Swiss-Prot record:
Quaternary organization: Monomer.
Positions with a binding annotation for substrate: H121, R150, D151, R182, R188, R253, S254, D255, R256, K322
UniProt EC number: 5.4.2.12
Entry's family note: Belongs to the BPG-independent phosphoglycerate mutase family.
Domain of life where this protein originates: Bacteria
Residue numbers binding Mn(2+) 1: D389, H393, H449
Protein name as annotated: 2,3-bisphosphoglycerate-independent phosphoglycerate mutase
InterPro entries: Alkaline_phosphatase_core_sf (IPR017850), BPG-indep_PGM_N (IPR011258), Metalloenzyme (IPR006124), PGAM_B_sf (IPR036646), Pgm_bpd_ind (IPR005995)
Residues annotated as binding Mn(2+) 2: D12, S62, D430, H431
Amino acid sequence: MTNHSVILCILDGWGNNKNSQFNAIAQADTPYWDSIISQYPQSNIVTHGPDVGLPDRQIGNSEVGHISLGSGRIVLQDLCRINEEIKNIRKNTHLLEFTEQIKRNNGICHIAGLLSDGGIHSSLSHMLDIIDALSYLKIQVVIHIFLDGRDTPPISALKYINILCSHIKDLNNVSIATISGRYYSMDRDNRLDRTTKAYNSIAFGDGKRYEEPISAVQDNYNAGITDEFIIPCVIGNYQGMNPTDGFIMTNFRSDRVIQILKMITEDQNTNHITLKNTIGMIKYSNELNIPCLFPNKKISNTLGEIISNQQLHQLRIAETEKYAHVTFFFNGGREEVFENEERIIIPSPSVTTYDLVPEMSAYEITDTLIKKINLQKYSLIIINYANADMVGHTGNIEATKKAITTLDQCLGKILKCIHNTNYILVITADHGNAEEMFDVQNNMPYTAHTLNPVPFVVCNYPKKIKLKNGRLSDVAPTILEILNIKQPEEMTGISLIDTSN
């Protein structure tokens, strides 16, 4: 081992794009970043498709990105894994046990999930396959649609609703019950007023009522409300849940289903309806004691575990929006804290959308980081700056430019702090976003992640090095080489430090 310590700085949503048009990063005022890329070794990292365990051309996301960064290997992601396993869904023992209980209770099945082909939180085909299986098993099904508009174009819901309606039109035991924008049904930032609106529509049939789903979406469009923000509403004569019913969540990503599922499964008050017979696609969290259709596989010997096994101290810092990513996901889906691992969560601003406060909590994260650096205690510090991603998702390029300038100032403060210390600053991202802000083909803001590579930069290294291009799973092995810690065989990534010369 050496005396080096490493700060892994994850600029969430910061991609490389040679085209400066509609590129918030290229257009922002970034003197410190310009200095960094002019004087420190750098390379490009791939964040999508098979390089991160996803299908070809499937864009990456924060969950996949942090799993890849922390595990140091290509992990077959839930999307790909479930794509294979769902082919035998009618024989899935977990589904059969779930439906047997519904039959015994003479109940119906509620299916909820993000109706999207974005591939980040869900797959439309998964929902359709499960609907078919339940119909085959002669279970009455009602569907609660969560609309996207974030990992898909902002006004694209009618496309997916038409696909769903066409699929179920000949299924007499299947109907659409509610519609909600993901802003309400998939909040992860403890804004429970949003989650409650979605819950009330599902549990009690509360909300504006429409005869059919197309008119519900069109009515919101006419009011200037796009997919993500569509207010929870009710379709047809849907009256709500009964305690004898069952509930399936078809999202395969955990962070944005926990709040709504806790409301559905846990007693809140005397007027609250809960469904004990609830099942998810994967094990979402230890907080949720519900079974799953496709159990996860354990990931061992992650970067965090290796640092802990070396009896070294490590620190994770992020604001609320990305806290799970630098902890749970970075540790390979492990919620328990490793020995000598510390975690600090900085509250995200309480605003409707982050273009209203593009600085988010970046300055607070930086101030906290600098205090911790000065302790000279930690061998590894992992921080996540959410700005480029979360502000980029709003599609507001001017606000995103302000977010990028904020990050630039934070990087300048970090570099000044680590000067003449043993800290080496490793800068990268989990995926792109802010570097591509407009969809020219569809003539609308582009709010999703991108297929662009992300930067990989090593700052303050004591000797001159060159870096190779690679993938996200190569970051952990590179950090281990810097720390002079042996890479375990489970890590199949390679160090990006070029030793060919």
